[in-house]
Amino acid sequence: MHGFRALKSEVIMSNMTNAAPHTPIQEADYSAIHPPSLLKRLELTNPVFWLSGSFLSLFVLLALTNTESLTAMVNAGFGFATKYFGAYWQVLLLLNFLIGLALAFGRTGYVRLGGLAKPDIDTFKWLSIVLCTLLAGGGVFWAAAEPIAHFVTAPPLYGEASPKTSAINALSQSFMHWGFLAWAILGCLSSIVLMHLHYDKGLPLKPRTLLYPIFGDKAIHGWIGNLADACSIIAVAAGTIGPIGFLGLQISYALNSLFGFPDNFITQSMVIVAAIVMYTLSALSGVSKGIQLVSRYNIILSVLLIGYILFFGPTSFIIDGYVQGVGRMVDNFFPMALYRDDTGWLSWWTVFFWGWFIGYGPMMAIFIARISRGRTIRQLILSISIAAPLITCFWFSIVGGSGLAFELANPGLISSAFEGFNLPAVLLAITGELPFPMIISVLFLILTTTFIVTTGDSMTYTISVVMTGSAEPNAVIRSFWGLMMGVVAIALISMGSGGITALQSFIVITAVPVSFILLPSILKAPGIANQMAKDQGLV
């Protein structure tokens, strides 16, 4: 027996020695020979998929079968979140902004992120993508409606004043909600932490990585990470589905007002289907093609409309309103940021917006980390925390400032359209006062759609990145999430605006866990930035 084993061993060794040299199969070749199953490509074995997908499915099911119960639960959760976490969110956003500025203006400002010597996307394209993605549909309808809302009902910090002063106060409060603090939480400190841990340390480009400085490997491989990813996906899906649904409702209303199209479920669904097709195709083509292209054309159309309104609109008031509004916001920056007296007003304005932006935070940080390689900390923070907010404020002055000027000249013209919080009616009332109102109104509707498309494609792409852990997720999962968000929006609007409104409020509830995902970035970003500065020989 022993001789047989020895002979067998000798034969095996001889065969191994004489065999042709082994050529390892490359990963791409292996994938071509053994393509992953649909189960794998959709990440159906991923617990994050089941956590996020099941929750969204349950939400839609409740919306369709028991709207009253869902609304009651969401309202209760909304009230709890704004009451007990509102002050925490206000401090969180303020600290995030101030620490970011300190890093930008210190030696750490020269730190180059992402392991590249220069940016891989040129500045105009990069800023276009950032602006269009973060503004979403709010960049048009809220720009028109929020200033008149604060004009009609004065913010409690300012109180009642003369009409002209009230108009500037209204712009100032709008600038606060869409300004420095809001933009900073969407991708400054959190993006710095993600870019270091992903590009320098090899950790996944996922929300769970933001918890790594606190929990270590447990955040990457344990249930904590799965929960962080799922909460972030639910929050951003809710924040994207809501605007998609409102796009259908608002464009349908506008088409009825302008052209007499029936304002019904069919028209609303057709608008959403068109948006689904556009943002899904854009997401499939990737960051370097579709997402850049849509963002670039979006910015070009915005600039053309800005030029038109500046030339034919209330130019003097727009410029004065912008300068005085920004000045008043800066002058009252800390009182506005930390205002806590009228909690009822806060819950529907400042704290609502802070919860909304926090809900987007981790996923936007991932998207910004993906497109910002090669930029310095100073470029990143000053572009997102300062330049982008000032551009946004100017856009609000163009659209909302025009509305205020028309209201001052003809009281009731814009405020009557706003009754019932009718956002598209305000926009149409403003464009109706400009030369060639029909053409300008249509262009604004196109702009609104492309704003939503840029958010839809970016978030479809980012959710797919989180699901797969790949910077270039497969087409199947991109298509799935793009279609899923649109289908959910259609399902919710089938029961009227109640389902979409509940979903919009729900994102504020999701901001409770998401705000704790963002907290480690505020605590750890300075140390990480200093370490990168040392590694790059800057200190």
UniProtKB/Swiss-Prot annotation:
GO cellular component: plasma membrane
A biological process term (GO) from this entry: amino acid transport
KW Transmembrane (keyword) present: yes
Membrane topology (UniProt): Multi-pass membrane protein
InterPro entries, alphabetized: BCCT_transptr
Keywords: Amino-acid transport, Cell inner membrane, Cell membrane, Membrane, Stress response, Transmembrane, Transmembrane helix, Transport
Keyword Transmembrane helix: yes
Subcellular location: Cell inner membrane
Superkingdom, taxonomy of origin: Bacteria
Pfam families assigned to the protein according to its UniProt record, in alphabetical order: BCCT
Positions of transmembrane segments: 44-64, 85-105, 129-149, 175-195, 231-251, 265-285, 299-319, 348-368, 380-400, 426-446, 480-500, 503-523
Induction data: Induced by NaCl upshock.
Function: Involved in the uptake of the osmoprotectant glycine betaine.
Family: Belongs to the BCCT transporter (TC 2.A.15) family.
Protein name per its UniProtKB record: Glycine betaine transporter 2
